[in-house]
Amino acid sequence: MAKRNAVVVTHTRLRQTGTVVAEAVSQLRVAGFEVAIIDNTEAPDFGVQPPCVSDDTEIVVVLGGDGTILRAAELVHCTQVPILGVNMGHVGFLAEFESFQIDEAIRRVSTHDYSIDERMIAHVDVWLPGATKPIEDWALNDITLERADRGKMVELSIRVDDVEMNSFGADGVIVSTPTGSTAYAFSAGGPVMWPNVKALQLIPLAAHALFARPLIIGSGSTFTIDILDDSMSEGWICCDGRRQRALPQGTRVMVRESRDTLRLARLSGVPFTNRLVSKFDLPVVGWREHARNEASSQSLHHGHTFPAAAYAAGVAVAGDAGVAGTEPDKPGERDGKAGS
């Protein structure tokens, strides 16, 4: 029988304090896997590829949150090894299972009962002033270019396919993949992009400009971001919140779709839309629905009966100050919560 290899990626605190890691390793070994455990993956330097898992690794099981999955992504970059995430954190957007489902997850892995979801990766070339070749890196979630001096703005020029689109002073910009559109870019006001969309988006951060808005480009296009020579601050680039370095004035950053992808193991057919609603606990019933519910029994006003449809359409009722319905929710009264 051929040897089966698996890698379990977690973090030191979880390994030291919890039994889930020991349980997962035990079950993988019972299923016939030789298991290696990685629990302390320091962020490598920007532009440096850390050692990857061996090509004969069948799967990488990640026990942790989305941050642990981003660390695991460095270990499988440029390989065909898939990642299976078991959420031990808060949102766990990339995870396939929750911690209480570990038995089912290992059983499905051992029988190859999973599909592969290939996620787009962003490639970045950093051209330092006077350089003859770029420093290369990549990101599953996002690439941020921010001000190095927290008291000053960084002056940037934004190009798409070598056509200048805008220039402004700002705290920085985020370039996000579809996977990263529910992370930092989402918090900065960017749109959610479905994973099957082949695109990159650029989100300005507190830009001092009237028309600095998010930009979305197709997979064949390139974002070019120049730190202007007269910028008051140097820049600071960071990939997936891990690999980072300072960038002087005159640096050019170019971001495009990578030829590589990340392979996520999927054990369920839950669509992304369902995952989005459940993970973010979206308040899909808004204040207008409360008006419909109140009107469903029909309201009698001044001797006239008004059907529920009139209320749902926002018809003004004689004698009322405004349209029928309730006021919007006050802060703290909404169902659900904001994203992570």
UniProtKB/Swiss-Prot annotation:
Entry annotation: catalytic residues: 66 (proton acceptor)
Biased composition (Basic and acidic residues): 327-340
Gene Ontology biological process terms in this record: NAD metabolic process; NADP biosynthetic process
Cofactor needs: a divalent metal cation
A GO molecular-function descriptor: NAD binding
Region entry Disordered, spans: 321-340
SUPFAM superfamilies: NAD kinase/diacylglycerol kinase-like
Coarse class of the protein's main subcellular location: cytoplasm
Superkingdom in the source lineage: Bacteria
Entry's EC annotation: 2.7.1.23
Subcellular location(s) of the protein: Cytoplasm
Cellular component, GO, one term: cytoplasm
Family: Belongs to the NAD kinase family.
Function field: Involved in the regulation of the intracellular balance of NAD and NADP, and is a key enzyme in the biosynthesis of NADP. Catalyzes specifically the phosphorylation on 2'-hydroxyl of the adenosine moiety of NAD to yield NADP.
NCBIfam families according to UniProt: PRK03372.1 (NF002892)
Name under which the protein is recorded: NAD kinase
Gene (name only): nadK
